Amino acid sequence: MIFDLEKNNFSEEIIYDVCIFGAGPAGISLALKLQDNNKRVLICEAGDENYSEQSQNCYKGIVKGDEYFDLDVTRLRYLGGSSNHWGGWCRTFNKMDFNRGDIGEYLIWPIEKKDIDPFFDETAKIIGLPKPERLNYRESISSNFSLESIEFDYAGTNFNTKYINVLKKSKNIDLLLNANLKKLIIENNKIKSCDIISYNFSTKNISAKNFVFAMGGIENSRQLLWQQKINNENLYDTQIPVGKYWMEHPHYTLGNLVLKKKFIFSPMFERSKIEVGFIQLKHDIQKKLNILSCGLRLEWPGYTNAKQIIADLACYAPNLSKEIFDLFNQNLMCAARVRAAWEQLPSVTNNITLSLKERDKFNIPRPILNWKKNSFDKKTIKATLDYFSQFLLKEDMGRLQVDDWIN
């Protein structure tokens, strides 16, 4: 059932099996699974059923370091969470994603790919992947270079619209809207209950056997740090690096590409539509170059922009540009913008901390995101681009023009 703390229509006095903070993809998925196991669940969603300024305002924060999005732009604070605006790009992990001990021991996960594989089919169904088989697609694109293409599948599932009726009808799940976590009540080193508060300052104490934070990486860290502080550091071991090692998959445009030949692998673009595919270095060459994974995405820029890219090529490769213009006019070549998303090296200085000055409506310190790219980021980008450029030259596929900021 769905209740609203703002309207004072929630009067349940039971002890829930699980109380979940956050009704985004993680919180809703967990609640549905617990419901199937006959558990009584309460989801406390800090926002409303739809977007509201009063809720979204609580997501404002401070960014220090490299330029980044405003923190209230990248996140949405209402039912469905980030699924209300995500693109739904999905792909499976590789075995190597869980173990890059060749770079450092801190890049070895405590779990392996085989530990999550049994949950793939169930997960694909929950998020509505239309063609999950695409995610296993990997194709070598050269016998001489360790390059492969991979595909993404696009769910784009909005957990608000997909599951709201399920939540309304559920007998085991209670969803409480406009319910902001105010304080965890700790007794004998265990969370016994919590105080929640609405925007009109209605309050409620909730008891549960277990509590789950599913508010997203930034908000989880913010609340854990704050709850630890107001509970005299009795919530968790102070040695646990809460808020530390914050990471992003940075997305940047790296340059322009002209192709003399069509690629021989499937997830590529046509002039009429984009089939977004990624090219990445295989793991053997990543290890050899001592870099992390970096996916290159080629985007068809449209006819006019493609001509401009080729025209720019004439400035530094006039002989090649004439050949390419001839192919372009015969519809035999492609131009593209090259974008990348790469994996970052964990850094303890990239973290979430609490502001000493700015607070939200409920007097909770706003988060500070401290984030900077480092020399390893640049090493990963440059090594990937250099290797891809060598492939283009030696296979006589085309030319890559790198943007100035890379160098």
Feature locations, PLM:
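Extreme N-terminal leader/targeting segments of oxidoreductases
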Residues: 1-18, 36-37
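Residue-level detector of alpha-helix initiation sites
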Residues: 24-25, 218, 375
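Glycine-rich loop(s) and the adjacent beta-strand/alpha-helix scaffold that form part
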Residues: 36, 49-50, 184, 195-269
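Redox-cofactor-proximal catalytic regions of oxidoreductases
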Residues: 60-133, 348-352, 356-360
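Conserved redox-cofactor binding core of oxidoreductases
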Residues: 102-191, 406
